[in-house]
Structures are given as structure tokens and as C-alpha cells.
Amino acid sequence: LGETAITLDVVAFITLACALAVYSLYASAVSLRDEAAAHTTLGPSVSGLVANGGLATASFAALGFFLTPWLMRLGGYPAATIALIAITVPMIATFLGLRCWVMTRLQGATGLGEFLAINYGMGVAAVAGLTLGAAAIVFLALVLLAAASLMSIVSSGAISNATCIAIAAVLLVLTGAPAGFRTAGQLTRLHTLLASIGAIGIVLMVVAQLGGWDETAAGLTRAARQLEWATTSGRGGGDYNLALAVAGSFGPGETWNGLTILSVQIAIACTLLLMVWLPWTIATTDVRQIGSQATIGASWGGFLMIAVTIILGMGTLWIDRSGVASAPVVPIPWRNIGDIDAALLMTAVTREYVWAEVVIGLGGAAALHAIALALLGGATAALRPLWLGRLQGKQAARRAVAGSQIAASAIVIGAVSLLFMPVDTLMSLNALALSLSPVAIVPVAAACWFPTLTRQGLIAGMIAGLTVATLEIFLPLISSIAVHAAAAGIATTVIVAVLVSRGRPHDTRQVTRIKANAAFRDIFAPGANDQSQGRYPRAILVALMWIFFASGPGMVIGNDLFGAPNLPRAQWDFPIPSIAVWQFLAWATGAALIWYLARGLGMTSVTRAQLDQINAYRNPPPAARQTGPNISDH
């Protein structure tokens, strides 16, 4: 090992990591046994998900740990604004979840890919599935790279990056390939506990490394030396440092800054919906878990994500690019653009605090393992029609399991192969994947709400949308308004799908979609005394307003509402900048709104009578034999 010294805390981390791996293998074996007994199609373990929001919390913790600061390349509060997808995703999932769950039950679909195949045929299902599968390979490569960097840091270099990648890949194949979401369900409590402890530990240790809460807050005023300045056109004095405010205003041409962040949120939110939330929603057997996951994931998981992102994002500002620390942080050489910014602070923290490797390592490993399992489960669910075909019954169940195992293994192998590319190339592929994958949300929404959009229209629209999104990445066409390529792809898909559907207004599966939508309306038609009928439009309006002010152009109001950041810190209403207060208020109100949607409006609940109606639609009772006129009643 050369000059690397293996200390007690490194040994403890390696030992506990091995224990986590062994337990993961055990959970995977149990999941596979349950899979074979139930003849299901890789659904999550409901018993492991009851009332604790583990899948959502662990997934968001992984984003808060690494992916948001890394992908966005932002320090400070702009990164925390992106982190509010921890609220946006559960909010949208609450609106979509019940209808999507019921529609799949009405039509007998057990996965996202099967749902699209039933409604639009193999063409739409194949385009959407292959797009999501390719994106999953890229995202999983980033997760493996993050895991390798984490393990290398916490082991003080005792384990090389290549070895870490190999270990993580083998563990994913052994745990994720056999049972996917079901394994995630078995591990959800452990993932949640370890990820939460790791997140809290990171926050406390980084703050201590920066000199305590007072020094951290006081150091915000010195952040001007680290990031460039931008204008907000007069709000609170005009020019704010990007570390302390979100650029943009309501002035001509400047609202696009807010729309840029909003469109980035839309891209990430749609990707998480398609690859994590909707596949899990469709696969779960208990519809009530939609509300539980959304509420707990947004409240606790959202809090962790925003807090960790702010601390890590602000902490990286204390280390300038020359490696000279401008606050009480151990000077660390600046790394290449492809490295995780947070790794700078993590290295400093692990050198300074005993047992930091154990806390950070296990928390990060649990969070990354959770989201990797979710990516594998979502991708295989989208790809399943490619190998399932028209099979039914036990034969279909066996092929579904075998095909999912092969597909998951192929995705992991593909992700590892991408790591041999230059980091800049990998980051370009990530930008492309984040732009293309959201296009698949259009056929899902069309099947649930707009059944008149035809198969031909959606195929043409998706091809056009994927083309425009790709061109927007490499040859920007609308860079003047700075909208993310995913938004351009979604808009193109919708426009082309509508135009082609008008020209060819019918397809062979349209009757199936119209009947299912009519059945949903009949089953969930409000009663005469139902007072919630008028609340749904108001709830949608409130949700749109929340998105506008919390994530869209309206967020610039928070720059100076509680004290302009270019004023002395003593004149602030709180010890932290105004935009930070605004973001935590956005988190609190967003979590409360999700709770109201899920509980107050019952958007994630189904009565026994409604379940009976759903089952009756899917499996209609045989027609009663009529009694002939010549048959006696005696």
C-alpha cells in the first residue's frame, strides 16, 4: 500500500461495508425467493415500504449527497434551488400516481413498458424503453463513479478507484439484477437509516471544519471572492454574488434565467418520475403507499437534500481553485472539472475527524446503492415488453424475471464500460441522457389523460423530440432564451404528436384507451354530496403557483425579502441570506401541500367499492345464463 496507512476507522469502514454487502446479498436472495413464489414481475416489497418512505428518502439523499452539486456544477444557493426537485417530484407524482396506478390495473399492466405497449403497441414502448434504458446506463455510470470516489476518499486511498468501481459493479449485479425494486423494498429501512445518519454527519462535520455555525454564516460574506457577480435589476440594490442569490428578474430578457432553472428542474423531475417513481407506483400493490412515499420523501428526504446541498455547495466556495483556503479548511489541490466538488471538503473532513470515514462512507454507500437499485428497476420495467412479447401466465413471469436479470446485468456492464471514456465525454453523455429521457413522459401522460393522441402521432412526435433535444445539446437552436434541451424536446414531441394525430385521428388501440379513461371517470366520479370536487382545480392552481415562486422566475423575490445580501450581515433578518430562508420556506410549504393533496383530498386513496369496480372492469363476471320461456320454475 506504499505510504497509505490503514487506520482503525478505515478498517471499521471496510468491515461495515462488507457487512452491508452481505446483508444486501441476503435481501436479494429473499427477494428472489419471494419473486418465484408470487410469480410477479419485480414489484417492490410493500412490507418494507410501509410508512417510512425509504425508497424516496434514500434516492433523494443520494441526489443531495453528490448528483445535484456534481451535475449542476453550481455552488451555493443556485444548487439548493435545483435541489427543490425533492418537492417537485413527489408533488407531480401525487397528481399522476393514482390515475397511473388505476389505469394500469384496469388494463392489466405490471410495468411502465407494458402500460405503453397495451395502449400504443410495441413501437411507442420500444422507443420509450430504449431511451430510458440508454439513459440508465449513463446515470448508473455516474453513480458508480461517485461510489468509487467516495470509497477511495474514505479509505484514505487504500482502495483504488478501479477496484472500487469493480466492487460496486459486482455488488449491483448480484443484488440488483435478480430482483430490482423488490430488493430495494427489502433494504429500504436500512438505506434510510444509514443515508440519514450520513447526511446529518456530513452537515455537522463540514460546519465544524469551517469553524462552526457562526464562522460558516460569517464566511458567507466572503464568498464574493469565489463566484462571479450577476444582476437582478434593482431588487435589493442590483448586483448580487451568485453564491448569495439567484440571478434573474422580471425585466425584459432576464426572466429567462428563472426559466432556465425551472426547465432544468423539469428535466430532472421527469427523469426521476420515469425511472424511479412511476415504475415503483405501477409495481406496488398498495396504492396508499403513493401518498406515504410522497409525503415522507418530500418532508424528511427533501430537508436532507436541501440542507446537504447548501452546506456542500457553500463549503466548496471556501476553497479557491489554486488550493488556497479562504476559511479554516485544510488546503487541497483543485481537481479536474470531472471530479465531484464535494470531494474536496470530504477529503478535508476525513483527514480531520476520527470515524468520519465510517459515517460518510456508509451513509453515502447506502444512498448510492438505493438509487442504483431504483435505476435498474425502472430501466428493466421500461424495457420488459421487448422480451415479454405476448406471453401470459407463469411462462410470462419466468421470462420476465430472466429477461430483467439479463437486462440489469447488461446495463451495469454498459455503465462500467462508459467509465473507460474521458470524464468530459461522460459528462457530455450525461447532459444528453438528461435531455432525451424526459421525452418519454409524453406517451405516459397521453395514455392517462389524452387518449385521442394516436400511436402514429406519438411515434413521430418522440422521434422529432429526441432529434430536437439532441441538436439542442450539440447545436443550440434556442440558446437565446436559455431553455434546457429537455424542455425543447418535450414541447416538440407534444406539437408533432398533436399535428399528426389530427391528420390520422384513429389507431387500432384507441378504443382501449378511451374505454379505460371512461372507466376511471365512472369509478372516481364525485358523489352529489362530495365537497372535494371544486378543490381539485384549486389544488392544481396552488401547485402551479408554488412551482412558479419556489422554482421558477418568482424565486428572485426571495433574494432580498429577508434582507438584501449586499447589505451588512447585521442588517439581515436572519443569520443566513434571504434566499436560504426563502428556500426552506419553499420546502416547508411544498411538503405541507403534498400532505394536503395526499391526505386532505384523498388523491392517493381508493375505497373497497372502487377496488371492486376496478377488478370487475378487468375481470368481468360471466354473463348470467338466461332462463328460457319453456323452463319451469318447479
Name each model-derived stretch.
Residues Y23-L32, A136, L140-L144, A148-T163, ...:
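Hydrophobic alpha-helical segments and their helix-loop junctions in multi-pass secondary transporters
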